[in-house]
Amino acid sequence: MAGAIIENMSTRKLCIVGGILLVFQVIAFLVGGLIAPSPTTAVPYMSVKCIDVRKNHHKTKWLMPWGPNHCEKLKDFDEAVSRQIEANDIVFAVHIPLPSKEMSPWFQFMLFIMQLDIAFKMDNDLKENAEITLDVSLAYRDDMFNDWEEIAHAIEIRKLKCTFGSPKTLESEGRHYDCDFLPFMEIGSVAHKYYLINIRLPVNERKGINVGIGEVKDIRLVGIHQNGGFTKVWFAMKTFLTPSILIIMVWYWRRITLMTRAPVLLEKVIFALGISMTFINIPVEWFSIGFDWTWMLLFGDIRQGIFYAMLLSFWIIFCGEHMMDQNERNRLSGYWKQVGPIAVGSFCLFIFDMCERGVQLKNPFYSIWTTEVGTELAMAFIIVAGICLCLYFLFLCFMVFQVFRNISGKQSSLPAMSKARRLHYEGLIFRFKFLMLITLACAAMTVIFFIVSQVTEGHWKWGDITIQVNSAFFTGIYGMWNLYVFALMFLYAPSHKNYGEDQSNGDLGVSSGEELQLTTTITHVDGPTEVYKLARKEAQE
């Protein structure tokens, strides 16, 4: 008889393999917790109010908040009123990064959110459901003396969601509203050293532009970028894991091709899972250090989506191949009800991502959540994907229940066997249940560490040792799924250990009648695994 390596491996060897994988798992968490810094850094920026003295030439002039060529500044809007400076001549300028610092390609991306300081005034109150129109421009340069080069310019509208905690009376004038943060900008690469943002709030009373938005005192931005130290650790992990998964994948497929039969469906799915994991691992991000690849965030989302779709499909097919009879097994079309929700949900999330980050490739200030239509469209895609995910897990839970029920039903036949044969089949059942529990543990660890990373301060301090929880989450979970795929391809590769007729029926002390009672008629030595044979007879009956 021949089957998977896990079915011919002794418990001692299986424990050794599990121990080695556990050591690598601990190392993956420690790399993020002890070596890598926090994954991201948030930097607050206060805009500087500049006077655009060159009227009607807004698009040809960049206003710097500081430096040798800084703009003419306004202290506050009272000064603007006293000097009779109109709102259309005021520009909010933000230089990135702060003085004496430089941006780096190791930061990988920049995400900005906006906070408006809006004061209450009786004659300029903030209307309900007010919208603010922003005329925003983004430029870059790589030297303090070079001219600014435009990256993007757009007219964007943001909805204001503000509350006022005091009565709206004369005594409350000057107090600020409590406004929600607004999405402002996202760029998928940091290829330049210096960036400049100019923000205008154009006013047109006839068209109702920026009317009824209250008295905007200041504009604050919070910039979030990936830490360079974390990026280097992340790239190093990808560089190390890529050949590891690639080698085991080649080894796995070579063992399959050496068999005299065609690959079965489960073997193909495991191989496809290895390909999708390799697709994630390949460190193409190294090229982003030298090239301005703004599409890397979108590309990363697509890679992760392919992997998770394959992982969910594998779990369904893994359970199904241990439950279905010979006529239904080994055909992908037999799983259309279970795999269909995965495909629909993945497609919805892909469309949503293209509507958000796909558009941001041309307009980094765009956000699908800023309009009623965009919000409804985004929510529709997310809700459909959520429904598909729920359907998937219902199918998966039902199939897992069916498999365990079938195997439990066959366990009643085990006492009638010889001791050696009974121990053999008990080992097969244990190994199947073991993989199911490991899968559950991996999923649970992913959820637990995600929750912990959200509710903690980002790091734990034990004496002189600081553990970066968020970094440990990223590196640990990333390493865990790599080890999971590695273990699948190693343990479920075809075993070349064959028992002769005398050995299989003599040494194990089993009669031919006993063999026929527990398995279907499989005469080929390269046939399905033993757990398939054991579980499938229940379905046939």
Swiss-Prot record:
GO terms for biological process: intracellular protein transport; positive regulation of Wnt protein secretion; positive regulation of Wnt signaling pathway; Wnt protein secretion; Wnt signaling pathway. One of its GO terms (cellular component) is organelle membrane. Its main location: Golgi. The keyword Transmembrane helix applies. It is a multi-pass membrane protein. Residues 43-232, 290-303, 353-380, 453-471 are lumenal. Coiled coil: none annotated. InterPro entries: WLS-like_TM (IPR047843), WLS_GOLD (IPR053936), Wntless (IPR009551). It is found in: Golgi apparatus membrane; Cytoplasmic vesicle membrane. One of its GO terms (molecular function) is Wnt-protein binding. Residues 1-42 form the signal peptide. The chain crosses the membrane at residues 233-253, 269-289, 304-324, 332-352, 381-401, 432-452, 472-492. Keywords: Cytoplasmic vesicle, Developmental protein, Golgi apparatus, Membrane, Signal, Transmembrane, Transmembrane helix, Wnt signaling pathway. Residues 254-268, 325-331, 402-431, 493-541 are cytoplasmic. May play an essential role in Wnt signaling pathway. May be required for Wnt-dependent patterning processes. Belongs to the wntless family. This is Protein wntless homolog.
